[in-house]
Amino acid sequence: MSAVLDTPVAVRRTAMDLLARREHGRVELTRKLRQRGAPDELIEPALDRLAEEGLLSEARYLESFIRYRSNAGYGPARIREELGQRGLDRGDIDQSLRESEVDWAARLEEVWQRKFAGQRPQDPRSRAQQTRFLAYRGFSMEMIGRLLSGRDLYD
């Protein structure tokens, strides 16, 4: 049976339980608390206090999400879109992607090697297939073109 979220203490405890599992953005945490029946007038003060105490951090959430999704084989465009759908500021997303220490070229090559076993496309159809897959994963057409044509990704 779920707890009734009708007091500031109950809302804070539930928010902290969610944050203990993994980082959350403010919008995502608000949505989850609403789904659990917490009223808006209790959610905002609780989240403000958690942010003041450093327990709720958009920067940490962005960093964690970028690391998690890039390790899963996704590129910057896909990650940017997913974070935008989660209600985060585009400027903050772009800054976090720039500051992340992800080597996108190496990540692209890993994903390509894993999916296509390092086999460069021999015909237009297989090139289109590989391009579609890598673009869907969120890598830029420029990087994909360099990889598939055998050019250096770091130029």
Curated annotation (Swiss-Prot):
It is found in: Cytoplasm. The keyword Cytoplasm applies. The keyword RNA-binding does not apply. GO terms for cellular component: cytoplasm. Keywords: Cytoplasm. Its main location: cytoplasm. One of its GO terms (biological process) is regulation of DNA repair. Modulates RecA activity. Belongs to the RecX family. This is Regulatory protein RecX. It comes from Pseudomonas entomophila (strain L48). The gene is recX.
